[in-house]
Each structure stands twice: as C-alpha cells, then as structure tokens.
C-alpha cells in the first residue's frame, strides 16, 4: 500500500507539471523556398504577429533554393503535427505534389507568391509580379528617353515571379524600338551571383545604359561589377524595396539604386489569415497585395516610415522576450510550489504509514 500511494502521488506530480506547460493552440508550419533578406524580413513579421496571439507556435523550414529539399521539408512539417501550412514554393513542378499531399490530408494551405499547378490550396496571397515588371519597364524607358541598352539580371529558371516580371518588362519596352536588351543574365536572387555573372559578361559595360535586376540584390550585384570593372555607372533598378539599413528603400535613398518597386512581405497578414482559417472565420480565397514604385523623389519619406516600423518591431520583440521570460519564471515557481506541496503530503503520508505500521506490529505482538 505504501508503494502504491507513493507511485500515485508521483504520477500526480508529473500530471500537474505537464498541465503547467501551456500547449500551443495552433502549430503553423512555414516552408520558405530560400533564405535571403526578403524571406528573413517576412519571417520576422510572422514571428512578431504571432506574439500578439495566444498559443501560436511557428515552425520554419528553409529549402535554400532546392525544390527537392523543400518537398521533403513540407512532408516533414506535415508529419510533425502542424495545423496549417504556409508555403512559398520554389519550382512548382517539384513543390506542387508535396503541397497537394498536405492539402489532401486535410491541412489548410496558404500559398504565397506562386499558385500550385493543381490549385489545391486554401488561400493564395501575392503581389502582381507582371505589373512590377511592366512598371519598371515604363520607368526605365522614361528615364532613358526611349533609347538605350539594358542588361536584365533575371531570377532563376522555373521561378514564376521571375517569369512574370520578365514578361511584364518586355511588354512595356516593346513600345520603344530603340531600347535593346543586350544581355539576359540568369541569376538566383543573390547579390554574389549577379556580381559574378555581370563581371564575366563579355560585352562592353560602358555601352550599357540601364540594369534591371529582378530583385534589389541582383541590381546591387551588378552595380558592384560595374564599379570593379571601372565602367560608367548605368541606371540601376530592382524590385523588393525592403525596409531596414540593407533594404532597397535605403539603397535608393543613398543613391546606390535609382529605383525599386515594393514587393510586400506581409508576414503579419499571413498569420492573421492563418488564424482566421483555423478559427473557422470567413477569409478571402485570393489576396493581391498593393505595391508602389520607389525613386529618389519618395525614398526619404518612405525610409523614415520604414525605419520607424523597424524600431517598433524590435521593441515589440524585446518586450515579448521579457514577457516570455517572466512567464517561464512564474511557471517554474508554480512547479516548485507544487513539488513542495507534494513533498509535504508524501512526508505526512510516510509518517501516517509508519504510525499505522508500528501500531499493527504492536497489536500483532500483543496477540501473540
């Protein structure tokens, strides 16, 4: 009886300690096709927004631009027990089957930026990549006066955003017969690759009047190549216009880029949408995010606003970290008090059992 009572109390302690740990209400898996400044900012926005909601756990996976890796990571996230999947697909031909498998298992899927081939998703969020390319084409044509040579540093083959930006750009400049794209260079969204490929281009960089990078890092990599080869600096335009000291807004304000186009990350909206889906609330099936051109004319104003957003986000994250620390301290204190209480009960039970044992022993001796 003594051992059974002790085991029962130990089980009670374990259960109480388990109850003391708050289980997440929702587990949201995030599958990013690559790691870069743009996706880092989106992840940070998701983390900040999740802090405003009780019981949200985020699980991130980064495929480092490898579609096969992303497919495996999606399957792994699903197997880990997530309640919803947010995914930015790499190459749709490779990623779509894994997304379909998640959807077929009843897991809601939010697809960002690229629609899957099967359309098996719960919601889709993106900006208009075709419009971005078209607007950049019009802007560059206007700045060049309808005449000049352009190097285009594209995104990787198979990338839907790169394809749409390319199409929009070329439709825009088709109206200007004296504008020539003298080189179409495939990149991978990184500054280093753009730098290496532009530097190795066999043409005369001094004949180039403009560079259109499919993102800001590509345009900045081209800028580095022009500078290293001692060539005349062309008009430099990209897409993303992220906030922060390394973002495109700052680069335009500082004069390193001539223009960029805001490609909104909106990680906060993705989390809000995810919670609405999980809570059973009404939500839009498709959301198109608004964007805008950033030039020297508006970059300083946008920079001031974006700097304030960055500062507030950092402060909120610090406050959340402190709050989590206090919460953990309280949970630890509660656990300690539970252990003290149970220890006291165990001690009291041991005393009672000892008294009963000696009484029964004494009674047995008298009877004998």
Which residues fall in each region the model found?
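Short beta-strand elements in bilobed, periplasmic/extracellular small-molecule ligand-binding domains
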Residues: 50-63, 150-152, 173-191
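An alpha-beta-alpha
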Residues: 28, 32, 46, 134-177, ...
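Bacterial N-terminal signal peptides
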Residues: 7-16
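Hydrophobic alpha-helical segments within soluble ligand-binding/sensing domains
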Residues: 70, 125-150, 193-195, 219, ...
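Hinge/cleft segment of the Venus flytrap/periplasmic-binding protein
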Residues: 19, 157, 161, 172-173, ...
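Flexible loop/hinge segments that line or gate small-molecule binding clefts
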Residues: 92-131, 142, 149, 155, ...
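Hydrophobic alpha-helical
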Residues: 84-103, 169, 183, 187-249, ...
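Extracytoplasmic "Venus flytrap"
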Residues: 27-49, 53, 58-71, 88-92, ...
């Amino acid at each position: 009886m003594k051992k059974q009572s002790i085991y029962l109390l130990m089980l009670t302690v374990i259960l109480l300690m388990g109850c003391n740990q708050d289980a997440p209400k929702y587990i949201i898996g995030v599958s990013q096709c690559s790691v870069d400044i743009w996706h880092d900012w989106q992840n940070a926005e998701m983390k900040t927004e999740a802090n405003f909601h009780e019981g949200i756990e985020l699980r991130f996976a980064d495929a480092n631009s490898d579609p096969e890796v992303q497919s495996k990571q999606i399957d792994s996230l699903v197997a880990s027990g997530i309640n919803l999947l947010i995914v930015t697909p790499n190459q749709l031909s490779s990623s779509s089957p894994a997304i379909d498998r998640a959807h077929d298992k009843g897991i809601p899927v939010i697809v960002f930026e690229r629609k899957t081939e099967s359309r098996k998703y719960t919601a889709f969020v993106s900006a208009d990549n075709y419009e971005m390319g078209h607007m950049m084409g019009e802007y560059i044509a206007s700045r060049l006066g309808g005449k000049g040579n352009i190097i285009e540093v594209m995104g990787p083959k198979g990338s839907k955003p790169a394809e749409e930006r390319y199409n929009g750009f070329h439709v825009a400049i088709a109206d200007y017969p004296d504008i020539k794209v003298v080189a179409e260079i495939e990149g991978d969204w990184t500054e280093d690759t753009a730098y290496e490929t532009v530097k190795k281009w066999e043409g005369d960089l001094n004949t180039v009047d403009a560079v259109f990078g499919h993102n800001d890092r590509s345009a900045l990599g081209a800028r580095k190549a022009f500078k290293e080869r001692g060539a005349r600096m062309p008009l430099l335009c990209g897409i993303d216009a992220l906030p922060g000291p390394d973002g495109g807004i700052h680069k335009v304000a500082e004069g390193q880029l001539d223009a960029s186009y805001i490609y909104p990350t909106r990680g906060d909206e993705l989390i809000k949408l995810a919670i609405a889906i999980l809570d059973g609330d009404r939500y839009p099936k498709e959301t198109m995010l608004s964007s805008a051109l950033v030039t020297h004319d508006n970059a300083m104003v946008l920079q001031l606003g974006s700097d304030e957003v960055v500062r507030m986000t950092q402060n909120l994250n610090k406050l959340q970290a402190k709050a989590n620390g206090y919460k953990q301290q309280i949970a630890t204190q509660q656990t300690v008090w539970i252990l003290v209480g149970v220890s006291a009960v165990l001690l009291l039970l041991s005393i009672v059992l000892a008294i009963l044992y000696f009484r029964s022993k004494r009674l047995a001796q008298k009877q004998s």
